[in-house]
């Protein structure tokens, strides 16, 4: 809001507030002057103190207005920082007005003074307006012309207001979370019905308990006592039955919510671009998918159930409390604003802690996942104890945050518990006074005390609900952060021709990984893959060979240049079609915890078993598969753990061949095979794939030398192209690599794909 509007509105209200309060005070004290009222002030009879409270809040608003007017940049920030001050002032004045009403009721029974009621009502209207005006002044936009020059420069660096406040963000997250329950509207209606029935039944129990006591103590009638007891029994049975149904339905609703959330999150994750998985660790993503979604559904289901139940109960309890004694009801409600404020402060702090705990748990989960998935490596270095220590340190970080949560909860229980104790003692004392003075019966007092305990339990539950909801909302924000994330690389191509020759052209390709923005992996790389020909990529480790494979698979966007498939950019092809016509067999193939048949036919909707067997035979996998106990139905285990390295590579080769792909990529695909198996695979490549485009990355000379074209890469550039004999005749890098390998002077890594280029979850190959 603009500065001048906020100032005018605030000053106008202050004038109206002072005039109205003063007029009411004057008309209510026509029989004595102001000085006489001050000299002989009587708290039971005078409203001078309420008039003074009006002047005090007007002074606060005037000071806030001047501060914002003199410095429209820093002033609103200071007002936001002093929210607690205005809250406490309004809270104190509101409670004092209730006390004033009770004091007046002791000397004027009933209170029929219209001026007192006018001032009492106006006090609460003015308090609400003062609170809103304080908020209005705190929202004056920085940069609005101020009365004092230089104020804007003083506030440089003031944070923008584009981000919604935490309360608004939490409310939006909760609303979004509940929107996922729309398919269960019928269940929600049924659960709400039984919730209302159960809550109303529980609400009537204290009332009829009081009737039973009055039947004994006052009427001394066994009939009235028996009738009240029967009603209490029926109410208890009915409410228990309804509560059971309510709980069961709510549990079902939020179990369905959990499934829905996990499904949406998983679908969002698998649709992200490949670089997303380079930047986010697997353990963090798994933590979001498992622990966070479970926490969201469990906490939200439990707390919404409790919140709705207690809201209905509070409504009924308040009605009965006022019907029994409005004076005791006012005493009761004096303490609840304090409890609500304490709950609000605690809830905000707990929400922040909850986010930190979830992040710490995700880091611990990532450490555990990394260690367990690489257990053979850990054991080969005898590093079990050190890994356990690392995991323990991560858990200790979680424990430190848990201690903060425990301390915060302890202080919250102290504050709310002491406030409730003060309220209960006040009710007991003042209620005894009302019974002795004949203003209420002993049965009504006992019923009221029971209602007060019920109300206290409800408010305590609502307080814990708030902290629980904040914890659930904190986890939900992280879940929705991934659900709502739009991939930066969208696979929206639509080309899916019936016939594809398989010609691939790299034209001046320049490429940089997002995780290494200052390092160009490929620089103006150009070469072609021809149909029916085998092309080999050769070069030292880190030269960019596997990056070419990643680009051909359309895993990453290009920085410059383009990659064409049959003359069309690969990004123009349909995602499923592209990966059906281009098949990759990597050095470390990944098999899924499924049968061998399912692994070979992975990604294809329907594949005849005969085609699976034929592909396995071409990959020299059929023999060992038939030797397994369950043959093609054998479960490969997690990541193919039940198979040897060579067996996994042959199954992966069969998975690629079953597609009969126009373009086949072999990235170190025979590195784990023995000489005989490699020979058979080579025969399959050169003998059965004449009409296919084959790209090979290999370190063995026997694999490379038979290629129709060899492309030599060095430091991201193409330095040589030609056949094996041509490149040897030219000399240069290729000849050096061959010579060193033949003489045993260079490790085989010279011809490898290099293990520094990005693959999933942050490991890089170059």
UniProtKB/Swiss-Prot annotation:
Function as written in the Swiss-Prot or TrEMBL entry: ATP-dependent low-affinity peptide transporter which translocates a broad spectrum of peptides from the cytosol to the lysosomal lumen for degradation. Displays a broad peptide length specificity from 6-mer up to at least 59-mer peptides with an optimum of 23-mers. Binds and transports smaller and larger peptides with the same affinity. Favors positively charged, aromatic or hydrophobic residues in the N- and C-terminal positions whereas negatively charged residues as well as asparagine and methionine are not favored.
Membrane topology: Multi-pass membrane protein
Site (Important for the second trafficking step from the Golgi to the endosomal and lysosomal compartments): 45, 49
pH dependence: Optimum pH is 7.0.
EC number(s) from the headed UniProt entry: 7.4.2.6
Localisation: Lysosome membrane
Domain ABC transporter: 504-740
Cited CDD domains: ABC_6TM_ABCB9_like, ABCC_TAP
Sections of the chain in a coiled coil: none
Residues at the site labelled Intramolecular salt bridge with Arg-57. Essential for the release from the ER: 17
Induction conditions: Not induced by interferon-gamma.
Consequence recorded when altering residue 45 to N: Decreases lysosomal localization
Residues at which ATP binds: 539-546
Signal peptide start-end: none
Temperature-activity profile: Optimum temperature is 37 degrees Celsius.
Record's protein name: ABC-type oligopeptide transporter ABCB9
Comment, domains: Divided into an N-terminal domain (TMD0) comprising four transmembrane helices and the following core domain (coreABCB9). TMD0 is required for lysosomal localization and LAMP1, LAMP2 and YIF1B interaction. The core domain is required for homodimerization and peptide transport activity.
Summary of the tissues where the protein is detected: Highly expressed in testis, and at moderate levels in brain, spinal cord, and thyroid. Not expressed in monocytes but strongly expressed during differentiation of monocytes to dendritic cells and macrophages.
GO molecular function: ABC-type oligopeptide transporter activity; ABC-type peptide transporter activity; ATP binding; ATP hydrolysis activity; protein homodimerization activity; transmembrane transporter activity
GO BP field: peptide metabolic process; peptide transport; protein transport; transmembrane transport
Ranges annotated as spanning the membrane: 7-27, 47-67, 84-104, 116-136, 185-205, 225-245, 319-339, 416-436
Enzymatic reactions: a [oligopeptide](in) + ATP + H2O = a [oligopeptide](out) + ADP + phosphate + H(+)
Organism of provenance: Homo sapiens (Human)
Enzyme class: translocase
Lineage: Eukaryota, Metazoa, Chordata, Craniata, Vertebrata
């Amino acid at each position: 809001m603009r500065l001048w509007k906020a100032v005018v509105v605030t000053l106008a209200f202050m004038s109206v507030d002072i005039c109205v309060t003063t007029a009411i005070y004057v008309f209510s004290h026509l029989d004595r002057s102001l000085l006489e009222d001050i000299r002989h002030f009587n708290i039971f009879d005078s409203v001078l103190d309420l008039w003074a409270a009006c002047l005090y809040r007007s002074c606060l608003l005037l000071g806030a207005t001047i501060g914002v007017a003199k410095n429209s940049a820093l002033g609103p920030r200071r007002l936001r920082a002093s929210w607690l001050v205005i809250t406490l002032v309004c809270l104190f004045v509101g409670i004092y007005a209730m006390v004033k009403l009770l004091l007046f009721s002791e000397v004027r029974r009933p209170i029929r003074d219209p001026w007192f009621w006018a001032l009492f009502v106006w006090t609460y209207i003015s308090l609400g307006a003062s609170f809103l005006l304080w908020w209005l002044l705190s929202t004056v936009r920085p940069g609005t012309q101020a009365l004092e020059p230089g104020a804007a420069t003083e506030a440089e660096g003031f944070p923008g207001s584009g981000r919604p406040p935490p309360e608004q963000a939490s409310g939006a997250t909760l609303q979004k979370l509940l929107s996922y329950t729309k398919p269960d509207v019928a269940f929600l209606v049924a659960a709400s019905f039984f919730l209302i029935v159960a809550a109303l039944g529980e609400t009537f129990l204290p009332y009829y308990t009081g009737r039973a006591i009055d039947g004994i103590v006052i009427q001394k009638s066994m009939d009235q006592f028996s009738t009240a007891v029967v009603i209490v029994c029926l109410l208890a049975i009915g409410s228990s039955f309804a509560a059971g149904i309510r709980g069961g339905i709510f549990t079902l609703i939020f179990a369905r919510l959990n499934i829905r959330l996990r499904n949406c999150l998983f679908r969002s994750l698998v649709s992200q671009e490949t670089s997303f998985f380079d930047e986010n660790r697997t353990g963090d993503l798994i933590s979001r998918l498992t622990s966070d979604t479970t926490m969201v559904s469990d906490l939200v289901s439990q707390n919404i159930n409790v919140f709705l139940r207690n809201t209905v109960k509070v409504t009924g309890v308040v009605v009965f409390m006022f019907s029994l004694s409005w004076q005791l009801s006012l005493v009761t409600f004096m303490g609840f604003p304090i409890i609500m404020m304490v709950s609000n402060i605690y809830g905000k702090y707990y929400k922040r802690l909850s986010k930190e705990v979830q992040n710490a748990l995700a880091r611990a989960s990532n450490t555990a996942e990394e260690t367990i998935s690489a257990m053979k490596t850990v054991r080969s270095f005898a590093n079990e104890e050190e890994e356990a220590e690392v995991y323990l340190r991560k858990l200790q970080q979680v424990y430190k945050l848990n201690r903060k949560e425990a301390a915060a909860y302890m202080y919250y229980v102290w504050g709310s518990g002491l406030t409730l104790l003060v309220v209960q003692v006040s009710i007991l004392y003042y209620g005894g006074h009302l019974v002795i003075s004949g203003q209420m019966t002993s049965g009504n007092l006992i019923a009221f005390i029971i209602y007060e305990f019920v109300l206290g339990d409800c408010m305590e539950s609502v307080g814990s609900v708030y902290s629980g909801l904040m914890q659930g909302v904190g986890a939900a924000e992280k879940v929705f952060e991934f659900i709502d994330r739009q991939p930066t690389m969208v696979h929206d191509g639509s080309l899916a021709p019936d016939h594809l020759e398989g010609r691939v052209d790299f034209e001046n390709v320049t490429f940089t990984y997002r995780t290494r923005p200052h390092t160009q992996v490929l620089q103006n790389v150009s070469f072609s893959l021809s149909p029916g020909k085998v092309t080999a990529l050769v070069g030292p480790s880190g030269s960019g060979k596997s990056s070419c494979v990643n680009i051909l698979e359309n895993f990453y966007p290009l920085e410059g240049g383009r990659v064409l498939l049959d003359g069309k950019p690969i990004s123009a092809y349909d995602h499923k079609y592209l990966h059906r016509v281009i098949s990759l067999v990597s050095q470390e193939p990944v098999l899924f915890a499924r049968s061998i048949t399912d692994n070979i036919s992975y990604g294809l909707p329907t594949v005849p078993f005969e085609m699976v067997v034929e592909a396995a035979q071409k990959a020299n996998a059929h023999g060992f598969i038939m030797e397994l106990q369950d043959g093609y139905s054998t479960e490969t285990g997690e990541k193919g753990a039940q198979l040897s390295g060579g067996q996994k590579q042959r199954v992966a080769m069969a998975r690629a061949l079953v597609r009969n792909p126009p373009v086949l990529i072999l990235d170190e695909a025979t590195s784990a095979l023995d000489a005989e198996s490699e020979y058979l695979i080579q025969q399959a490549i050169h003998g059965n794939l004449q009409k296919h485009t084959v790209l090979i990355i290999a370190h063995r000379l026997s694999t490379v030398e038979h290629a129709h074209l060899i492309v030599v890469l060095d430091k991201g550039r193409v330095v040589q192209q030609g056949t094996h004999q041509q490149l040897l005749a030219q000399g240069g890098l290729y000849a050096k690599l061959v010579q060193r390998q033949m003489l045993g002077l260079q490790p085989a890594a010279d011809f490898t794909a290099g293990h520094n280029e990005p693959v999933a979850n942050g490991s890089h190959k170059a």
